[in-house]
């Protein structure tokens, strides 16, 4: 939410829809309705994701780590992300990390299959203790998620990222 609110507080070069959706955990209901109504040409889904970079968790089960920048997914349980967007994000020069697991999912699962299909990228802020009353995130990861979202929005809207 903080990344999207920060984007809305700035004057953007391009028009875009911002959606704060509900009921992601019980069927992506808000995202389904929003994607169908807005009928986007492209989508950048912003979210928090499980970092699991804590003591007692095997390294192979750590999806991403705090301080490594936002995580960018190539695939998850519900979505195969746009390859050009994924590669552009990783080559942007903005600190980010590939998400190391294809488990789980997010609102992209509803957005990318809406209507005739929507090219989609997910930018995920690594969080410890996600879905608890208090999650922990690295402020630099949030700032880099904002920078990456703005970079991708500009690149997609201008046609620089195809």
Language-model features: where?
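Hydrophobic/aromatic beta-strand patches that form the interior of the parallel beta-sheet core
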Residues: 19, 42-44, 121-123
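Acidic, glycine-rich active-site loops and adjacent beta-strand->loop/helix elements
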Residues: 20-27, 48-50, 127-129
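A glycine-rich helix N-cap at a beta->alpha junction
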Residues: 35-54
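Short, well-ordered secondary-structure micro-motifs
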Residues: 29-32, 53-58, 109-110, 133-134
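Alpha-helical metal-binding/catalytic segments enriched in His/Glu/Asp
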Residues: 1-27, 148-152
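Alpha-helix C-terminal capping segments
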Residues: 6-12, 36-39, 112-117
């Amino acid at each position: 939410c903080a990344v999207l609110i920060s984007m809305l507080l700035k004057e953007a070069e391009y028009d875009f829809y911002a959606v704060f959706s509900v009921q992601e955990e019980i069927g992506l209901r808000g995202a389904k309705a929003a994607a169908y109504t807005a009928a986007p040409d492209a989508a950048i889904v912003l979210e928090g994701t499980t970092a699991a970079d804590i003591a007692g968790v095997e390294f192979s089960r750590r999806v991403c780590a705090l301080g490594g920048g936002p995580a960018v997914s190539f695939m998850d349980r519900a979505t195969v992300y746009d390859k050009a967007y994924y590669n552009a994000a990783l080559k942007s020069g903005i600190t980010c990390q590939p998400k190391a697991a294809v488990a789980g999912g997010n609102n992209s699962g509803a957005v990318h299959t809406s209507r005739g299909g929507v090219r989609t990228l997910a930018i995920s802020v690594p969080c410890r203790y996600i879905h608890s009353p208090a999650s922990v995130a690295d402020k630099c990861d949030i700032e880099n998620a904002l920078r990456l979202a703005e970079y991708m929005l500009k690149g997609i809207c201008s046609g620089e990222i195809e």
